[in-house]
């Protein structure tokens, strides 16, 4: 009997304890709810909308670039801010309210905002731009913006008038773009003036006992510029040390063989020992200038440059690079380099600007001073941020015009924003190789891209969704 009474007493205690626990839990939930409502009420979004708590940072590595550190927010319902919808998942942003000067826009990759009344612009990354899915039908207030800093070989159809003129705003390597990225691989004028890696000419002359006068470092072989064909021919007239996968005849130390090490101090020290470096781009386009040009200038090595036809507009000084386009044949170029190699005074004329720390090109200085973004600079926006804000600001400019009863300003890209001629074969060799990537791949690809551009434009102008089958049927239509 005593045992039964004890069990009843224990059960009663457990019930009382459970009741107290539930009451305390309920009170905590109520208090938390009050706190969340207070936080919601005091958020800084205008028109009473909620600013959600930030999640941990999201890293998105850009091709060939330093990873961008990007924040994202959970979700935001808004009818007060223009929505900038990234149609390419470049940033990974699920939702972020961005400040662009006095303007604010909501940036997202969430395609559920496609039909939202405040969606004003669609942002595309050129390499990812394809026909599989486009935001159609396109409404009158829908702006399209293109970000494309890379080689045309990544997406040739963008470089034809029918496609490039689909976009209202651009950020490309061209100086004519709405946001020029021509100097995207140059940190600033100070790195050009720096003597940190400069090897004295006397030392370079001594090093010539074991090093060639020229160095070539490429691992992207047989690109549209056909640079390997030129260098292969040049090698028959002058010695070239070739690292990398293309025409390799010399090995880097094991720790420097990874492409990621091409900005390593050890790699710089090796390359800086040479007198000349073959700086050949993978494509020939106006203002398409990569690290292949800027790196030797930073190291105190004379670049032997082939690529942008407009490169003379971007030289630090009038005599700071040897331009391949000024020589009719690789043999002539080899003879000139050999002459400089044996004449210190002639050679020093190409590095005099470096020794004096004088960058005289006003176009280059102005471009560096006025650009709205930085390279590897934590104190400046990166060029993705600058692109987003350019579009945001232009959208707001039109909103303000319409609020005044004025028509919006219509922006439109043109072919100068991505100017690349058809890939061409070098005419120096009378005997063509049995197989050439240029003849067999890049020239046919360029020709087909013309048809793709025309087909895409016709389908987009029709302003309704289309299938891949419809697209390719138009491309290959007789």
UniProtKB/Swiss-Prot annotation:
Q: Which reaction does it catalyse?
A: L-threonyl-[protein] + GDP-beta-L-fucose = 3-O-(alpha-L-fucosyl)-L-threonyl-[protein] + GDP + H(+); L-seryl-[protein] + GDP-beta-L-fucose = 3-O-(alpha-L-fucosyl)-L-seryl-[protein] + GDP + H(+)
Look up and give the membrane topology term: Single-pass type II membrane protein
Q: Which residues are glycosylated?
A: 110, 168
The protein's predominant localisation is endoplasmic reticulum
User: Any one cellular component term from GO for this entry?
Assistant: endoplasmic reticulum
* Any one Gene Ontology BP term: fucosylation
Q: Which GO terms describe its molecular function?
A: alpha-(1->3)-fucosyltransferase activity; fucosyltransferase activity; peptide-O-fucosyltransferase activity
Its keywords, alphabetically, are: Disulfide bond, Endoplasmic reticulum, Glycoprotein, Glycosyltransferase, Membrane, Signal-anchor, Transferase, Transmembrane, Transmembrane helix
This protein's pathway reads: Protein modification; protein glycosylation
**Where are the Cytoplasmic topological domains?**
1-8
- Which residues are listed as membrane-spanning? 9-31
- Which residue pairs form cystines in this protein? 389-392
The catalytic activity of this protein is classed by the Enzyme Commission as 2.4.1.221, 2.4.1.-
Query: Where does the protein end up?
Result: Endoplasmic reticulum membrane
Please list the residue ranges that the record places on the Lumenal side of the membrane: 32-478
The family annotation for this protein states: Belongs to the glycosyltransferase 10 family.
Please explain the role this protein plays, according to its UniProt record.
Answer: Protein O-fucosyltransferase that specifically catalyzes O-fucosylation of serine or threonine residues in EMI domains of target proteins, such as MMRN1, MMRN2 and EMID1. Attaches fucose through an O-glycosidic linkage. O-fucosylation of EMI domain-containing proteins may be required for facilitating protein folding and secretion. May also show alpha-(1,3)-fucosyltransferase activity toward the innermost N-acetyl glucosamine (GlcNAc) residue in biantennary N-glycan acceptors. However, this was tested with a library of synthetic substrates and this activity is unsure in vivo.
Write the protein's name.
GDP-fucose protein O-fucosyltransferase 3
């Amino acid at each position: 009997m005593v045992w039964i009474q004890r069990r009843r007493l224990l059960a009663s205690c457990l019930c009382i304890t459970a009741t107290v626990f539930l009451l305390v839990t309920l009170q905590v939930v109520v208090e938390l709810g009050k706190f969340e409502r207070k936080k919601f009420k005091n958020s800084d979004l205008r028109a009473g909308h909620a600013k959600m708590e930030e999640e941990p940072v999201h890293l998105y590595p850009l091709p060939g670039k330093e990873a961008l550190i990007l924040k994202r927010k959970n979700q935001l319902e808004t009818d007060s801010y223009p929505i900038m919808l990234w149609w390419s998942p470049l940033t990974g942003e699920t939702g972020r309210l961005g400040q662009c000067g006095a303007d604010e826009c909501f940036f997202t990759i969430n395609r559920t905002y496609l039909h939202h009344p405040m969606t004003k612009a669609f942002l595309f990354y050129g390499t990812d731009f394809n026909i599989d899915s486009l935001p159609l039908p396109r409404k009158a207030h829908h702006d399209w913006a293109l970000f494309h800093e890379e080689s045309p070989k990544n997406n040739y159809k963008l470089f034809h008038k029918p496609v490039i003129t689909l976009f209202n705003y651009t950020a490309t390597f061209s100086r004519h773009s709405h946001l020029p990225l021509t100097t995207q691989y140059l940190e600033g004028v100070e790195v050009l003036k720096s003597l940190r890696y400069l090897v004295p000419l006397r030392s370079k002359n001594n090093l010539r006992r074991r090093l060639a006068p020229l160095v070539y470092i490429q691992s992207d072989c047989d690109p549209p510029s056909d640079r390997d064909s030129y260098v292969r021919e040049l090698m028959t007239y002058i010695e070239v040390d070739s690292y990398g996968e293309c025409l390799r005849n010399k090995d880097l130390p094991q720790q420097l063989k990874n492409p990621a090490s091409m900005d390593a101090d050890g790699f710089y020290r090796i390359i800086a020992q040479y007198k000349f470096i073959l700086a050949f781009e993978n494509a020939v386009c106006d203002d398409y200038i990569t690290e292949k040009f800027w790196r030797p200038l930073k190291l105190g090595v004379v670049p032997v440059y082939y690529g942008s036809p407009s490169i003379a507009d971007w030289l630090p000084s009038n005599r700071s690079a040897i331009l391949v386009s000024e020589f009719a044949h690789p043999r002539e170029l080899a003879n000139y380099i050999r002459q400089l190699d044996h004449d210190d005074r002639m050679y020093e004329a190409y590095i005099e600007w470096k020794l004096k720390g004088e960058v005289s090109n006003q176009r280059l200085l102005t471009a560096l001073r006025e650009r709205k973004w930085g390279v590897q600079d934590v104190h400046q926006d990166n060029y993705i941020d600058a692109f987003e804000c350019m579009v945001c600001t232009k959208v707001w400019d039109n909103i303000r015009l319409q609020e005044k009863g004025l028509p919006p300003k219509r922006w439109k890209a043109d072919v100068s924003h991505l100017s690349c001629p058809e890939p061409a074969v070098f005419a120096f060799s009378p005997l063509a190789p049995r197989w050439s990537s240029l003849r067999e791949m890049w020239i046919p690809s360029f020709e087909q891209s013309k048809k793709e551009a025309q087909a895409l434009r016709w389908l987009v102008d029709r302003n309704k969704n289309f299938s891949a089958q419809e697209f390719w049927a138009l491309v290959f239509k007789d």
